[in-house]
């Protein structure tokens, strides 16, 4: 690369240029500020008062033109009521740069603005103040512009007004033209240095609040990235801060201990007026204390009581006014600083241009090989060029700016490395996820619900460990080849973070495969246990839970030995963790069995009715019971009912442990007429999680069963009564029937037709008797007679003559037929 020539690249500008770009911008501003559109569109703008005149006199007394600051504040009762609940804002910047116009648009004030006829001269003299906001909660300070020709080289007044604004303002705006950024003199960077120094010496206490400095970049240019402007300004600020000699108690304090910085920009007022107004309205929201993004944060409030503001301002101004140590740096130092800064900026720009190729590579998402080697070489070359060009200037300034340039270059490389590290981290993360997923999927194929063999999972953890070690080795090599020496310490955390992520991914893969193995085992054990306990649930016997517990204990003993072996071979779990996981698996499987029992609640009424019928309505051979007069219906009924209700009580609770058999959820009144009842409260010592049928469900089911029991009991009693009738016919009645019916008997025997008819009817009666259908025949005959009589009466009811008579002897009864039908059924 060609040697950088100070003459070629860093030529000095004429002292009195005829037409600079800045003057052109000023001309635009003069036209803009005097445009009719520059009138603040508001009904009641706040004009404010001049609290410090151009000669430095404070407004401590009333004059014909204005009241004193004290009387002005006293005329604002709404402001006095606020106490310390208000904020103050001021603005610094070059003369005729549109500061007053900006304040007028932002805060509904009416500060005096530039008149084109008068040329670019001072519009704001000294310091003006106004109250803004619907509740007078904002104090606005408009300061005289800097670098004006009226004061020539007398910078003392500018510095004093700047220091004054810093002492009272929560927020201080610095108004800059975008084309002045990076120009030390035009952007008032030297003034900021003095402000910082004197602010520390005069005002900063341990408890003093911070000040927020907001840089407002005016006439924003589309081809200049705002982020770059922001970085340039912050770099200037940090360079200035590095040169500030603070008091001893703040020797190591960073600038953000005393100041915060924010940046915003606005388009050209004249050329882009609509955009300007729109963005100012957006900016205005930042000055609303109720907005969550407000500039007026509590930590910036100077906490000056409203009624003491005038006294405070006067004392502060007198303190600043009497200060005698406000001289500019020496001309030689200024020249050295300006030229070294200019050369540094040029070197930085060349460096930035030279690495655009690498920036494009990273922007496309590609990793730069040998990142450390490439950029270390370029930084060394840039610093060497800087030393060659600046060797004529003050050594201390050269070294100071060189250190700042080095920080800039390293900062730029650091930002690129952040992208490089991001891409490397993304690539290594993708690799980790891909390789671990492949291994996990291979072992997931071992799943077989009907079989569980823990030995198939044995090599999984070993393969994951080998893969993890290879990835960590590759990551360390790639990282070492990319990290420049000056970033070695800063990037340790990033390296360790990625290593930690690899470890987390490894543990996650082991955990996921462990979960797969647990799920495999659970499905296998459930598929083994459920078919074996289902018959016991359907049989509904008193030893149901005992048999279920036996099945579960046997399967658990055999199965969980396999699971424990699987945990030891597949994962790195310790003994306590394995025991905990086995306990969780047992709980999950028992919950699954409990769900199986709960699902059978729907079938429970049918199972209980079947149980009752098997004991009461069927004999030991499974045939329908034929009730004889000698049968003890009550004993059989109560025995069947009690056992059925015992089965119901067993289903009320998940009796997976032997101690669970002691809990009762129903009250059975043995051998009595009272129906069973559900116990409303949970038995002492019982676990609510094991309850299968709650109180309401038990109560409803008992009511259903009681109706079923009573119905079966009544049917049995009726059948028994019918069977007793055939044993109650007297012998003398049989003799009388034979004696008086002998002639009819002979007539039947001698008449073939009557004889055959008698045999048919008699055979039918005999069969009905043997089958115990007498009661059914009796009910059916009653039904036919009732239906015939009902039909006849209803027919006669339709005849007007018989209607009154029929209504008296045969009232309407719609339920009569239904009851008869139900009786027949």
UniProtKB/Swiss-Prot annotation:
InterPro entries cross-referenced by the UniProt entry: G_GB1_RHD3_dom, P-loop_NTPase, RHD3/Sey1, Sey1/RHD3-like_3HB
Coiled coil regions, renumbered to chain: 373-397
Every GB1/RHD3-type G domain range: 83-305
Cytoplasmic face of the membrane: 1-728, 774-825
GO biological process: endoplasmic reticulum membrane fusion
Compartment annotation: Endoplasmic reticulum membrane
Keywords from the UniProt entry: Coiled coil, Endoplasmic reticulum, GTP-binding, Hydrolase, Membrane, Nucleotide-binding, Transmembrane, Transmembrane helix
Main location (coarse class): endoplasmic reticulum
Name this protein carries in UniProt: Protein SEY1 homolog 2
């Amino acid at each position: 690369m060609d040697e950088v020539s100070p003459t070629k690249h860093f030529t000095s500008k004429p002292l009195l240029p005829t037409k600079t770009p800045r003057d052109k911008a000023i001309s635009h501003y003069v036209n803009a500020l005097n445009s009719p559109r520059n009138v603040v569109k508001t009904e009641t703008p706040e004009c404010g008062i001049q609290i410090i005149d151009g000669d430095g006199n404070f407004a401590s007394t009333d004059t014909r033109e204005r009241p004193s600051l004290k009387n002005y504040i006293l005329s604002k009762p709404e402001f006095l009521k606020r106490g310390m609940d208000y904020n103050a804002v001021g603005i610094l910047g070059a003369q005729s740069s549109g500061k007053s116009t900006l304040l007028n648009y932002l805060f509904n004030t009416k500060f005096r603005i530039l008149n084109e006829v008068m040329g670019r001269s001072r519009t704001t003299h000294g310091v003006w103040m106004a109250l803004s906001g619907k509740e007078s909660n904002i104090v606005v300070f408009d300061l005289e512009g800097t670098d004006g020709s009226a004061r020539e080289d007398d910078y003392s007044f500018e510095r004093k007004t700047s220091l004054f604004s810093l002492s009272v303002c929560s927020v201080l705006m610095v108004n800059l033209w975008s084309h002045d950024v990076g120009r030390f003199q035009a952007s008032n960077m030297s003034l900021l240095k003095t402000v910082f120094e004197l602010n520390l010496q005069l005002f900063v206490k341990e408890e003093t609040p911070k000040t927020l400095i907001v840089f407002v970049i005016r006439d924003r240019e589309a081809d200049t990235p705002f982020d770059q402007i922001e970085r340039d300004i912050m770099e200037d600020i940090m360079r200035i801060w590095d040169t500030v000699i603070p008091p001893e108690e703040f020797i190591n304090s960073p600038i953000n201990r005393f100041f915060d910085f924010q940046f915003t920009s606005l388009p050209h007022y004249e050329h882009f007026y609509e955009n300007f107004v729109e963005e100012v309205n957006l900016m205005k929201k930042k000055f609303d204390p109720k907005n969550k993004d407000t500039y007026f944060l509590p930590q910036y409030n100077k906490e000056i009581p409203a009624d003491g503001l005038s006294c405070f301002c006067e004392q502060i101004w007198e303190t600043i006014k009497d200060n005698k140590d406000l001289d500019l740096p020496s001309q030689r130092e200024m020249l050295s600083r300006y030229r070294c800064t200019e050369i540094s900026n040029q070197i930085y720009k060349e460096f930035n241009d030279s690495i655009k190729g690498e920036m494009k590579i990273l922007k496309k998402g590609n990793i730069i090989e040998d990142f450390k080697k490439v950029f270390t070489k370029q930084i060394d070359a840039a610093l060497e060029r800087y030393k060659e060009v600046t060797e004529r200037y003050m050594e201390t300034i050269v070294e100071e700016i060189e250190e700042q340039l080095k920080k800039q270059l390293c900062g730029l490389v650091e930002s690129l490395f952040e992208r490089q590290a991001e891409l490397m981290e993304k690539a290594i993360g993708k690799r980790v996820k891909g390789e671990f997923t492949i291994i996990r999927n291979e072992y997931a194929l071992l799943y077989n619900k009907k079989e569980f063999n823990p030995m198939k999972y044995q090599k999984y953890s070993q393969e994951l460990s080998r893969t993890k070690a290879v990835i960590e080795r590759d990551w360390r090599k790639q990282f070492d080849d990319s990290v420049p020496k000056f970033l070695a310490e800063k990037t340790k955390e990033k390296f360790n973070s990625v290593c930690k992520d690899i470890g987390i991914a490894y543990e996650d893969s082991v955990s996921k495969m462990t979960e797969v193995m647990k799920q495999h085992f659970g499905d296998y054990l459930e598929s083994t246990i459920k078919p074996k306990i289902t018959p016991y649930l359907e049989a509904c016997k008193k030893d149901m839970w005992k048999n279920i517990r036996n099945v579960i204990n046997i399967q658990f003993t055999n199965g969980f030995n396999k699971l424990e072996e699987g945990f030891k071979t597949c994962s790195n779990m310790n003994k306590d963790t394995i025991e905990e996981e086995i306990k969780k698996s047992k709980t999950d499987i028992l919950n699954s069995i409990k769900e199986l029992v709960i699902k059978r609640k729907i079938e429970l009424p049918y199972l209980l009715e079947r149980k009752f019928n098997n004991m009461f309505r069927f004999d030991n051979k499974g045939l329908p019971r034929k009730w004889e007069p000698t049968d003890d219906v009550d004993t059989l009924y109560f025995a069947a009912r009690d056992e059925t209700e015992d089965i119901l009580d067993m289903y009320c609770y998940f009796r997976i442990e032997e101690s669970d058999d002691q809990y009762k959820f129903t009250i059975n009144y043995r051998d009595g007429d009272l129906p069973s009842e559900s116990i409303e409260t949970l038995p002492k010592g019982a676990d609510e999680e094991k309850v299968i049928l709650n109180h309401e469900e038990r109560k409803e089911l008992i009511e259903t069963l009681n109706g079923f029991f009573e119905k079966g009991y009544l049917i049995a009693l009726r059948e028994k009564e019918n069977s007793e009738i055939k044993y109650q016919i007297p012998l003398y009645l049989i003799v009388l029937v034979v004696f008086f019916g002998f002639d009819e008997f002979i007539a039947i025997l001698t008449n073939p037709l009557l004889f055959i008819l008698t045999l048919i009817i008699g055979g039918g009666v005999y069969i009905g008797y043997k089958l115990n259908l007498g009661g059914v025949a009796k009910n059916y005959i009653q039904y036919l007679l009732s239906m015939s009589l009902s039909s006849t009466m209803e027919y006669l009811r339709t005849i007007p003559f018989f209607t009154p008579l029929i209504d008296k002897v045969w009232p309407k009864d719609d339920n009569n037929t239904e009851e008869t039908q139900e009786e027949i059924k």
